[in-house]
């Protein structure tokens, strides 16, 4: 595990020296060079169709043989695209070669596909089973960090932490991470974000009352407070006062060592969006208000997974330049990806939230209330909403790939799409946390 060095804020004019255990982060941005794959090839490479077995044609059927796609040709075209950009200046943007610890005699064998049932009718793409060696190592490191570095949870919460399966989650979402150290950047942030959600908002003592003050002070653990000499010491002391702030502070310290200043600022901005969404949901909870469906979806554009896929370049060891990230068409892609993945969470956590005390807002609940539908019909309509958002995300990504076929853009889009798919796979397979309603 990398040495985090002294935790806490950094001077605004001084960026920490990158940790020696994450040597792959580029020192400079290679020039962008247009590449040849078309947008349609790009999308096909992201999500190759899953073959559905059909009856074998009668032997000797020439017409059937002629209608069958040439698997060799299709496979070679797919591999050509997935290899990434080629040509001058694109070497650093190819999907990274992994640098994992050498296999030991007791290393796990290739994993069998995990159990779990997808929501019927949900449009999604399967992902390869995450590398078990990586999953095991990330799981080991994150537990050591949680227990030894940030004292994240009391002993009786250990089962919940293990059931979160965050190692499998992050390995599935970041298939191009060059090292386990890079994967740990995302894993610490994910765990810290969930600690804030659980402890401030939901499961472990959270409450909408006073949430704004708690979130603002926690946000200073990732976006440092700049003040006078008199008031800085009590602020620094506050950063160790509870588990969420300790986790935010430590995870962000690791992140800024590997990220560029613009990547770190992007993450801070996306976390401010997330906290704004938390506050809207809390305000509705305090007044027992059920928003209109469109209002709920607007809230979920902020209270969603956006901060997770948008660090795909940092975790991949490269950078999407700030001007390309800020393009309106890129912002639309990112927003649609976040919106679709968040409805996945609503669908898989539906029964869990119904069994929890109080009323939890999720898309099926809001649709049922506002559109006067049965629970089943509201849930099925929420599936349709997700599917429309997912298709819109993929169409927007294809349009952007065609309009701006630069290596960094294409790789970033692939990374976001991989995160969307990995996020669904984690929800589908995490039967410790999620189960489906009996609507089919």
Swiss-Prot record:
Cofactor (UniProt): Mg(2+)
Database matches in Gene3D superfamilies: Farnesyl Diphosphate Synthase
GO MF entries: metal ion binding; terpene synthase activity
SUPFAM superfamilies: Terpenoid synthases
GO biological process annotation, one example: terpene metabolic process
Keywords: Lyase, Magnesium, Metal-binding
Compositional bias annotation for Pro residues: 48-58, 102-111
Signal peptide: none
Ranges of compositional bias, category Low complexity: 17-27, 59-75
Region named Disordered: 1-116
Record-listed E.C. numbers: 4.2.3.118
Pfam families, sorted: Terpene_syn_C_2
Record field: catalytic activity: (E)-2-methylgeranyl diphosphate + H2O = 2-methylisoborneol + diphosphate
Protein origin, superkingdom: Bacteria
Binding site for Mg(2+): 197-198, 202, 345, 349, 353
Function: Catalyzes the cyclization of 2-methylgeranyl diphosphate (2-MeGPP) to 2-methylisoborneol (2-MIB), which likely involves the intermediacy of 2-methyllinalyl diphosphate.
Extra remark beyond the main annotation: 2-MIB is a volatile organic compound that has an unusually low odor threshold. Together with geosmin, methylisoborneol is responsible for the characteristic smell of moist soil as well as unpleasant taste and odor episodes associated with public water supplies and contamination of various foodstuffs, including fish, wine, and beer.
Protein family according to the UniProt entry: Belongs to the terpene synthase family. 2-methylisoborneol synthase subfamily.
Designated name of the protein: 2-methylisoborneol synthase
Organism name: Streptomyces ambofaciens (strain ATCC 23877 / 3486 / DSM 40053 / JCM 4204 / NBRC 12836 / NRRL B-2516)
């Amino acid at each position: 595990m990398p040495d985090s060095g002294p935790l806490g804020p950094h001077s605004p004019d001084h960026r920490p020296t990158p940790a020696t255990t994450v040597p792959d982060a580029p020192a400079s941005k290679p020039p962008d060079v247009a590449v040849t794959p078309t947008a349609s090839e790009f999308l096909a490479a992201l999500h190759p169709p899953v073959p559905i077995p059909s009856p074998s044609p009668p032997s000797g059927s020439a017409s059937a043989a002629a209608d069958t796609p040439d698997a060799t040709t299709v496979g070679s075209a797919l591999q050509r695209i997935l290899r990434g950009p080629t040509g001058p200046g694109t070497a650093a943007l190819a999907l990274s070669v992994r640098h994992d610890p050498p296999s030991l005699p007791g290393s796990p064998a290739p994993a069998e596909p995990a159990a779990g049932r997808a929501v019927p009718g949900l449009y999604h793409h399967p992902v390869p089973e995450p590398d078990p060696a990586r999953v095991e190592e990330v799981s080991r490191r994150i537990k050591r960090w949680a227990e030894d570095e940030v004292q994240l949870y009391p002993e009786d919460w250990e089962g919940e932490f293990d059931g979160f399966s965050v190692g499998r989650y992050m390995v599935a979402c970041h298939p191009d991470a060059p090292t386990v150290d890079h994967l740990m950047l995302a894993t610490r942030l994910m765990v810290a974000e969930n600690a804030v959600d659980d402890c401030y908002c939901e499961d472990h003592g959270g409450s909408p009352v006073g949430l704004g003050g708690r979130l603002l002070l926690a946000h200073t653990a990732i976006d440092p407070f700049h003040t006078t000499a008199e008031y800085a010491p009590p602020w620094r002391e506050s950063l160790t006062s509870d588990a969420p702030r300790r986790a935010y502070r430590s995870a962000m310290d690791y992140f800024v060592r590997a990220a560029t200043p613009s990547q770190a600022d992007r993450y801070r901005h996306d976390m401010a969006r997330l906290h704004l969404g938390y506050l809207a949901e809390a305000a509705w909870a305090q007044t027992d208000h059920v928003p209109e469906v469109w209002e709920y979806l607007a809230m979920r554009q902020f209270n969603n997974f956006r901060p997770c896929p948008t660090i795909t370049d940092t975790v991949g060891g490269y950078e999407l330049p700030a001007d390309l990230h800020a393009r309106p068409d890129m912002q639309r892609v990112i927003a649609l990806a976040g919106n679709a993945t968040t409805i996945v969470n609503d669908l898989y956590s539906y029964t869990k939230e119904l069994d929890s005390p109080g009323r939890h807002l999720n898309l099926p609940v809001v649709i049922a209330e506002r559109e006067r539908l049965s629970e089943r019909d509201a849930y099925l309509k929420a599936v349709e909403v997700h599917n429309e958002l997912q298709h819109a995300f993929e169409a927007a990504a294809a349009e952007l790939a065609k309009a701006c076929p630069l290596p960094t853009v294409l790789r970033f889009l692939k990374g976001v799409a991989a995160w969307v798919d990995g996020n669904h796979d984690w929800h589908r397979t995490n039967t410790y946390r999620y189960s489906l309603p009996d609507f089919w």
